[in-house]
Structures are given as structure tokens and as C-alpha cells.
Amino acid sequence: MKQFLLMLLASAAMAQNYQPTPENLNARQWFQDAKFGLFIHWGVYSVLGRGEWVMNNEKITVADYEKLPAQFNPTEFNPAAWVAMAKDAGMKYITITSKHHDGFAMWGTKQSDWDIVDRTPYHQDALKMLADECHRQGIKLFFYHSQLDWHNPDYFPRGRTGVNSGRPEQGDWNKYLDYMDNQLRELLTGYGEIGGIWFDGMWDKPDADWRLARTYGLIHSLQPAAMVGSNHHLKPFDGEDFQMFEKDLPGKNTTGFSGRSEVGALPLETCETMNDAWGYNSNDKHFKSTTQLIQYLVKAAGNNANFLLNVGPMPNGKIQPEFVQTLHAVGDWMGRNGESVYGTRGGPVTPRPWGVTTQKPGKIYVHVLDWSDELLALPKLANVRSATVLGSGQKVEVQQVDGGTLLRLPAGRDAVDTVIVLAADGR
């Protein structure tokens, strides 16, 4: 614990001079307006079809795991179709795994041959193909990058995971960090404009010196507008530009990941899976419904956060039809109701059991997700000029009473989300 506290203090001291550039501040504004992104967990682990943690969970050694790339040949990978699918769903950015915890690079890295170009029969740079397509279709691309590495021998001393990989009990930690920074330099100089870096894995060695100021400084020097975030489950470090929450809304801790996290002032994001797995799992049929996912997106917006929704492509490069169909349905809803999500911030009424509110200048959107009564009582909202149902324009009666505002909700409400638009002066 003492070492961990020292790490926090040292990192803060080293990064305390970080001043976001105007480009970075503009990127943060764009990010908060975008609201909805596609998360992609794809790597050599998809060959086994048992999720991205299979190497650790099944205690597979490096020697055995290195046999997998020979079977990874995603000839049906179509980056244009992936990007079109994301845009059809109403998503504004894509975050893809450049390297997950197994250390396998999904681009042609020059730092080792443990990558898709050198080790697989595919021999193509998947990240370059996707980056080029994102630029063509006008959607931002972020890279998820694991700081944790179960393959590299210099990731030493070992952390909490990957202890059965069969690596020698020796290594050079600073050499590993140099390796990681050199890979990041490749990603930030060879793939055009990048939206940001989504770090993960620092929780594996919370007492280590991760040289965060140096790594974050490298990113900002190469691409000042690139946003840095880390899934470390702690309050944000100086040098970070957005804060994420894994499988939880900001301020919640239903999954146990966010117990030491505090909601800060940075842009927020929550990520979630469409079934139970991040990486492709052929046995996982626990698909979330379209209603569940739309309501999670709406709740995220009401909590002033983005929603990053994950797919785990198959080893052949295709995305499961169940995912494609659900994303299309979400996109159809966003096409009709996106006004109440895009470009909004959390509304004046804090999240309630019945739903959430969002807002933008001149308008408050009341998202009624679960409420059967005719009357909905809100805290006092002054200067409300009118209320209508989004889409139909049906008028909604508004009553100002002592200490509150009452809405008389219409019959035949939407089972997913009845959105009431309040036109309000002074907002």
C-alpha cells in the first residue's frame, strides 16, 4: 500500500504541469457531444472462441499460445462493412484493441514479431486497414492498448495475472516500458489522426512505477488532440483527458470494479458488452435485448457519460449476425430519437428510478423508461414554456405546483423510452 501511494504521488508530481492544448479541449467537447461509440475486442484469442482472457483463465503457456497465430486468418475481415455498421447504429467513434493482455499486436509492429503481419497467414495490418476506412468514412478511431502483457518476458516482476505463462522469472521493467512507448509511437505516427488511447491493465501491478507522465506526454506531444484515458478503476491522474467506467454507470459499483474510483470533472464514458464476453465466445448466447442497450445508452447520457458498446468479432473477421441485427435496431431508434442524446449533457433532474433527463440549450429531455402512472412529479423546473412528445409532437400537460413540476403523461407510451421535450427559457 505504501508503494502504491508513492506511485500516486510521484505520478501526480510528474504530470502536474500538463495543460491540455486548445485542440485537446475541442476534442473533449466533441467527445461529450458524440455520446455513442463502438468497442471492438479482436485478437488471436478469437481462434479459441472462449474470450480474450483465455490465456490466463486456462493457464496456457507462452509456448502453447504462440501456436494460435498460425490458425488466425481473417480473410472475411471487411473494414468498410465494420465502419458502415457502426455508423448505421448511430455510433460516432470506434475503439479497437491494438494489443490486449496477451501482448499480440494487431498491426505490423517493428518492436517484435509477435503481431498479425509476421505471425499469421493473413500477413496484413488490420489496424491500418481499419484506420484508413475510418478516415474515408469520417468516423474517429481510438486504440485500446493494454499496459499489461502476458507474453513479454520484461513484464517483470509479474503482476496479479498471467503467472502461469511459463516465462522466466527475470526481466527488465524499464525495458518493457520502453517497448510499450515505442509501440505507442508507431500507432500515433503511422495511422493518421487518432482520437485517443484507451489504456487498460494498470490494475495488474498497482504498486509499479508505470512512468505515466512520460507515456502520456509522448502521446500528447505526437498528437495533441488525442485523448488519454485509463481503465485503472481509480480517480483520474493528471495527464488524462477522459474517465471511463467498466460495466457500470458513473458513480455506481455494481460490478466491483469502481470501488476506488471517484467521478471527476473530465468527460465520462461507460463500456458494456452485448452478451457477457468482450472477445469472441462461441458459447455465450446471453445476448442483451435492444431495449436493454438503448436504455443503458440513455441512462449513460443522463449520467453525463458516453456509451461504448462492444462486439467481439469472429476469427474469420466477420461480426456475429446477432450483434449486427441489434446494432441496426439501436441505430433505427437513434435515428428517431438522437436529438435527445447527441450533443446533450446530463439534465437538471438527477437520475431517478423512472428514468433520466438530458439537456441542451433551450430544451430539457425527460426520458421515461419505467413509469406506469399518469402523473410524473419532477423537482421544480422554472420557465418551462411547453412540453411535447419527441417524434409525434403530441402536447403534454405541465402543471407547476408547490415545490415541483407535474407532467401528465400520454397513454400509449413507448415501451423503450417515452421522451418528453420541455421547451425552457434560460437554458
Label each PLM-derived region with a short phrase.
Residues 16-427:
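Mature catalytic domains of secreted/periplasmic carbohydrate-active enzymes
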Residues 3-12:
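Sec-dependent N-terminal signal peptides
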Residues 1-4, 86:
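Positively charged n-region of N-terminal signal peptides that target proteins for export
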